[in-house]
Amino acid sequence: NDALVGSFDIPLVENEGDTLKIVFNSEKTIGFIEKAQVLFYENNYAIKQEYVDLANKLMDNTALMTIFRLSLTDSLRDMEADYMILPCPKYDEAQQNYCGFTHNGFSVFCIPVTCATPDIAAATLEALCAESYRTCTLAYYETTIKGKLARDTDTAEMLDLIHEGVRFDFGYVYSASLADLIQIPRNYINNGKTSKGASTLAKKVELSEKKLPVLLEAFENLQ
């Protein structure tokens, strides 16, 4: 469900002057929740299970498709049936491009306060990350994913399409500090078809709005 927020081009946080504003309480978010509830609870072709179980069903040929992170391709290497990788769907025909958020599970470095030369340590880490982006990431994407795991040229083309639409949303990246903002639609959908997205979305977002100034102040104190 979280992936569809990105593919449907639903912003969580946007710039407003010299600050940020949560814009997740929108008609589009409500529309997404309502459509997802229809998909999961008014038809018999959607399976609501844990990610790992859905991946196993795909590999066992008991599911036609699943939404998953690109890391799943490592597990699909030994899958007997052919498979394709496709971008997540658009919200509607009016949406111009395929897009998606990066996941909010990032690796980070921490420099201890006992470090005698924090500026040098930070510069070194930044240089290593930059070089990794230029070499390791490229090798993984072009050589491993496209060259070894993709089973046809169409999949390689789809990967480029997905890569071109990747973007960051502050509200997703820092969701854990914003009362789990990205998880609001997921929780509604998991609660069943009786869940009313429009009636309680504002209350949930209001809690995130209270957390945002605290997070921004923490960033300002780093300067």
What are these regions (language model features)?
Residues V113-A122, A130-Q223:
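Conserved C-terminal helix/tail region of periplasmic/extracytoplasmic solute-binding proteins
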Residues I33, Q37, A55, A121-L125, ...:
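Extracytoplasmic/secreted envelope proteins and their assembly/folding machinery
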